[in-house]
Amino acid sequence: MAVYKNLSPEQTVLLQQGRVAGVDEVGRGPLVGDVVTAAVILDPNKPIAGLNDSKKLTEKKRDALYLEIMDKALAVSVGRASPTEIDELNILHATMLAMQRAVAGLTIVPESVLVDGNRTPDFGVPAHAVVKGDGLIAAISAASVIAKVTRDREMGELDARYPQYGFAGHKGYPTKAHFEAISAHGVLAEHRRSFRPVREWLEANS
């Protein structure tokens, strides 16, 4: 597996040749919910303007790009790993599993896969890790948007079920508001029990 850092424009173009799937993840850090990944194969004949790392985009822009990606991309797939799988495997291995599921779910088999970050799982096709790839490679940027919007919407649904936890605001991340909600209301089935704040609450309240 090659890991690319500080790509030149020529390297960036070279990596995007052929039928390439971009892959990114969202949700490694939260205390609750699935880790969500997406795989996207873009159509070179239908360019999408404004793609970037999803964290650098406004929610309104992400939502608009989500619709455009779903409309124009050749293939889009979402893969995930559950809190139970995260607890059993650890977050790194669960993320790799979710990425494999995303690529396996594509309706078109890619010739290669480009993953944001510094490592990739085995996809059965050539794969390369691209550091900060979500800001460099259009297909990874698109995957970043799909994964982010998907997970944020799921946190909104969880917020509707458990409004006292404030998931729509903190998205499950370990914020002061989330810690206070756990202290006041306890741990949910959707919480990741292997993550220290959740584990410590369970140990203190067992």
Swiss-Prot record:
Cofactor (UniProt): Mn(2+); Mg(2+)
Domain RNase H type-2: 18-206
InterPro entries, per the entry: RNase_HII, RNase_HII/HIII, RNase_HII/HIII_dom, RNaseH-like_sf, RNaseH_sf
Lineage: superkingdom: Bacteria
Molecular function terms from GO: manganese ion binding; RNA binding; RNA-DNA hybrid ribonuclease activity
Keyword RNA-binding: no
Subcellular location: Cytoplasm
Keywords: Cytoplasm, Endonuclease, Hydrolase, Manganese, Metal-binding, Nuclease
EC number, as in UniProt: 3.1.26.4
Pfam families referenced in this protein's UniProt entry, alphabetically: RNase_HII
Catalytic activity line of the entry: Endonucleolytic cleavage to 5'-phosphomonoester
One GO biological process term: DNA replication, removal of RNA primer
Enzyme class: hydrolase
Binding, a divalent metal cation: 24-25, 116
CDD domains: RNase_HII_bacteria_HII_like (cd07182)
Cofactor binding annotation: Manganese or magnesium. Binds 1 divalent metal ion per monomer in the absence of substrate. May bind a second metal ion after substrate binding.
UniProt keyword Protein biosynthesis, yes or no: no
Covalent S-S links between cysteines: none
Gene Ontology CC terms: cytoplasm; ribonuclease H2 complex
Function comment: Endonuclease that specifically degrades the RNA of RNA-DNA hybrids.
Family label: Belongs to the RNase HII family.
Official protein name in the record: Ribonuclease HII
Organism this protein belongs to: Shewanella amazonensis (strain ATCC BAA-1098 / SB2B)
Species classification: Bacteria, Pseudomonadati, Pseudomonadota, Gammaproteobacteria, Alteromonadales
